[in-house]
């Protein structure tokens, strides 16, 4: 993974956020979804659906960190609320994509993506697979440790996020093409794809890993990949990820932001 900022961080105030954005604490008691980004130039005017703001907008500057006290709060959120929030976002993605695919192809049930060229884009880390336990067990909890994460990736010790697997499998059953777009490096490609396949998420039409030589931000690279897919004739509906950089600058129809209170990738 290419992490520009990875820190102890919980959104506690809208002071740090773009004033056009809706911000709530991710420790909310309900798991409702709503439009967390609206008419933002960073999203190409596309809506992003989530259960909260997560971390600062890409327009924020500098290192955003709240200090080293929130470990207990992060664990509390993970143990009591995260699963419900993940389920809500995934359910929203399934419901929206079902309606979008039917209207796009003008058919009520099963689709044939070879005719309609419908596609969904998925991030990997903390979207399809969870790195929470890796971060928790880091020498300094929730501070990124590249060696530990690489070992977990190589051994497939990153558990599946079940609601996203459900969405992935639903899209496949409807004939929607699935593409993997991840900041993981190319030398992690084989381990990652083998792990995803073992978790029941396979038959993707393409998998894109960030090249070592690419020096721009994750948001710029992922946008370029989506644009290449569009240029190849794919109609991208949902873009699903845990970072706004998974759905920045457009080239998708609707974004779905999985909850992540641990780190921020620009």
State the predicted function of each range:
Residues 93-104, 128, 132, 171-175, ...:
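Sec/Tat-exported extracytoplasmic proteins
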Residues 2-7, 11-14, 19-122:
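Non-catalytic pre-domain segments flanking phosphatase-related domains
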Residues 33-34, 38-40, 53, 87, ...:
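C-terminal cap/substrate-recognition subdomain and adjoining C-terminal extension
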Residues 129-130, 135-160:
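Metal-dependent phosphoesterase signature
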Residues 150-179, 186-187:
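Short, acidic loop-to-helix structural element flanking the phosphoryl-transfer center
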Residues 95-98, 166-169, 194-197, 227:
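Surface-exposed alpha-helical segments enriched in charged/polar residues
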Residues 125-133, 246-247:
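Short acidic, Gly/Ser-rich segments with clustered Asp/Glu that frequently serve as metal-coordination loops
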Residues 103-114, 169-170, 228-231, 247-248:
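Surface-exposed acidic, glycine-flexible loop patches that form ligand/cofactor-binding
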């Amino acid at each position: 993974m290419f992490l520009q900022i990875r820190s102890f961080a919980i959104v506690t105030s809208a002071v740090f956020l773009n004033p056009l954005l809706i911000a709530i604490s991710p420790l909310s008691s309900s798991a409702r979804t709503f439009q967390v980004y609206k008419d933002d130039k960073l999203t190409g005017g596309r809506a992003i659906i989530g259960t909260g703001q997560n971390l600062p907008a890409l327009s924020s500057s500098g290192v955003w960190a709240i200090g080293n006290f929130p470990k207990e709060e992060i664990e509390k959120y993970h143990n009591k609320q995260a699963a419900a929030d993940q389920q809500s976002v995934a359910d929203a993605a399934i419901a929206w994509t079902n309606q979008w695919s039917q209207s796009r192809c003008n058919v009520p049930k099963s689709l044939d993506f070879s005719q309609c060229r419908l596609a969904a884009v998925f991030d990997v880390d903390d979207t399809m697979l969870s790195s929470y336990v890796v971060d928790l067990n880091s020498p300094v909890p929730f501070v990124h440790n590249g060696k530990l994460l690489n070992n977990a990736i190589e051994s497939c010790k990153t558990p599946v996020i079940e609601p996203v697997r459900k969405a992935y499998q639903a899209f496949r059953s409807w004939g929607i093409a699935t593409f993997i777009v991840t900041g993981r490096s190319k030398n992690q490609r084989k381990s990652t794809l083998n792990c995803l396949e073992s978790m029941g998420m396979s038959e993707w039409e393409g998998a894109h890993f960030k090249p070592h030589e690419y020096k721009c931000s994750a948001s710029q690279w992922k946008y370029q990949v989506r644009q290449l897919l569009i240029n190849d004739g794919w109609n991208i509906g949902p873009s699903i990820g845990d970072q706004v950089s998974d759905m920045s600058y457009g080239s998708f129809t609707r974004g779905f932001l999985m909850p992540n209170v641990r780190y921020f990738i620009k």
